[in-house]
Structure formats: C-alpha cells, structure tokens
Regions:
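Short runs of predominantly hydrophobic/aromatic residues within well-ordered alpha helices
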Residues: 1-4, 96, 114, 138, ...
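Structure-specific DNA junction-binding interface
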Residues: 1-66, 235-238
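Generic structural signal for hydrophobic core residues of well-folded globular domains
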Residues: 5-13, 80, 103-106, 121, ...
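Helix-hairpin-helix/helix-loop-helix acidic hairpins
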Residues: 57-107
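Active-site-adjacent structural elements in folded domains
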Residues: 82-90, 98-104, 125-129, 168-180
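Helix-hairpin-helix
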Residues: 99-121, 141-142
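Phosphate-backbone recognition surface of nucleic-acid-processing proteins
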Residues: 118-176
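Low-complexity, acidic/Ser/Thr- and charged residue-rich accessory regions of DNA metabolism proteins
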Residues: 172-238
C-alpha cells in the first residue's frame, strides 16, 4: 500500500497510473522493476504523452545519475523500498512529523513534497496519525499568507495555518458563513494550507496589483464531462 501511494504521488497523474496498470498485472512491490517501468514511461514520453501532473513542481535533479526525471524517481522508490525497507520505519512512526522527517531526508523530496506524501499516507489504513499536530506551508500557501497579512508579528506561517484551523467555527459564525462540511469533518491543517494556496491563485486574477513572484495562472481548469464518483478515506466515516 505504501509503495502504491508514493508511486502515484510522485507522478500525481491518474493517466500515468492507468498506463502502468495496463502494462503490468498489478502495481505492487512484487511487480516493480525499475527498467520495466522506465521502458513503459519512456515510450509514453516518445509518443507525446505527459506523465507528470503540473499542479506542483516535483524536484528534477539527477540525484541517482539519470538524465530523465522519471528514472530518478523510480530509482528513489527502489532505494526506499528494496534497499531501505522504508515501510517498516513508517508504520512504526507515532506522528505525522516523525514520518515527515524520515521521508524528507531522501533525495528529490523537498519539505512540501514530504508533507504531501505523509498526508496521503495518513489517509490510508496503514497508519492513524493525528492531523491537527503538524503542517508545512507550501510555496502557494506562503504567497497566499503574504497577501493576507501585512505583519505576521511573531507568528510563523505554520502558526497562522494552525490559528485558522483552531478558530474556524467561531469565524464562520462571526462572518455568518454557512460552511458545508464533508460529513461532520472540520477543515484540517492541510485544508487550511490549501486554502491559502487557492487564495493566491484567485488574487492573481481578482487583485493583480498585489505583488507576487507568480503573476499568471499556469493552467486553466477544464471540467470533466464524466460523472465523478467521489470516495473518502474509510477512517473519515462518511
């Protein structure tokens, strides 16, 4: 399960997952072979198919000596699981931050990517960490926070995200907002972090005079025509 989560998240593209699934009996550590996976992905690239989602930038250095980003990511997975047996370490972690510190020490994994990975791991059944103890402000969130506050005082960016999480209900009431939860689940730290990121994107269009190192929206949203059947982590009990 952990291998599947990390493999999907490194590419973060459903069509890439389906491509691999169509070429192998199943996506598991038993079927994982760096050369075989690389061949499938390289063939897709040669046919003009994008294998990475551009929602966020994944690190693209040659940490494992390969010219292609996907080859370095496959080598990373091989080191994590076949050499280091990272799954044995992760399942023993008591907190999200503990797992974050393990993952972020690997090449090609920055702080925000490590946070995204541990968040997705925590949605699974293999661990059950608290979600309200740890967060990391990503690049978009940092820009969003900067556009909201002239002076943060002594608060860190993560402190601001935590404050938003802790005071959400009283602020909804104060602002007379009828906020619709997913089930009975309040906004979590990752949700508040994401809100600041989306705010940054919104402000680029709505208030372009606000200074930022990002000016344009790099991708336009195109809704799918097919109906989406949403599923939620079992532990949410929705």
């Amino acid at each position: 399960m952990l291998f599947r989560i990390l493999l999907f998240k490194l590419f973060n593209k459903e069509s890439t997952w389906e491509l691999l699934l169509n070429n192998f009996e199943d996506i598991t550590l038993k079927t994982f072979n760096v050369k075989d996976y690389s061949k499938v992905l390289e063939n897709a690239i040669s046919n003009g198919i994008k294998i990475y989602n551009d929602a966020y930038i994944s690190c693209a250095n040659k940490a494992f000596g390969y010219d292609r980003k996907h080859d370095n990511h496959l080598a990373l997975l091989n080191k994590m699981f076949n050499e280091d047996r990272i799954e044995e370490k992760i399942v023993k972690c008591n907190t999200m931050e503990e797992a974050f510190n393990i993952i972020k020490n690997y090449p090609l994994i920055g702080n925000f990517m490590a946070y995204q990975l541990v968040t997705d791991i925590n949605y699974s059944e293999i661990v059950n960490w608290r979600e309200d103890e740890f967060t990391v402000a990503g690049p978009g969130s940092l820009r969003g926070i900067k556009k909201c506050f002239i002076d943060k005082g002594k608060m860190s960016n993560e402190d601001i995200i935590k404050y938003m999480y802790e005071h959400q209900d009283e602020e909804f009431k104060r602002l007379n907002l009828d906020f619709k939860r997913i089930g009975n689940r309040p906004l979590q730290l990752i949700d508040c972090q994401n809100i600041f990121c989306e705010l940054d994107k919104y402000c680029r269009q709505a208030i372009p005079d606000l200074k930022s190192n990002r000016i344009k929206i790099k991708k336009r949203y195109s809704p799918k025509k097919e109906k989406i059947n949403y599923i939620y982590p079992t532990k949410w009990k929705i």
